Amino acid sequence: VIGGQECARDSHPWQAAVYHFSDIECGGVLV
């Protein structure tokens, strides 16, 4: 992310994770 900044804790509660079996491969957050 270019020009990004930290966000306040719990301000973006919608998170996603992509699993391959039991390993997390990628993740993201809805902003």
From Swiss-Prot:
It catalyses: Preferential cleavage of Arg-|-Xaa bonds in small molecule substrates. Highly selective action to release kallidin (lysyl-bradykinin) from kininogen involves hydrolysis of Met-|-Xaa or Leu-|-Xaa. Transmembrane segments: none annotated. GO terms for molecular function: serine-type endopeptidase activity. It comes from the Eukaryota. GO terms for biological process: proteolysis. Pfam families: Trypsin (PF00089). Residues 1-31 form the Peptidase S1 domain. Its EC number is 3.4.21.35. InterPro entries: Peptidase_S1_PA (IPR009003), Peptidase_S1_PA_chymotrypsin (IPR043504), Trypsin_dom (IPR001254). Keywords: Hydrolase, Protease, Serine protease. Belongs to the peptidase S1 family. Kallikrein subfamily. Glandular kallikreins cleave Met-Lys and Arg-Ser bonds in kininogen to release Lys-bradykinin. This is Kallikrein-1. It comes from Cavia porcellus. The lineage of its organism: Eukaryota, Metazoa, Chordata, Craniata, Vertebrata.
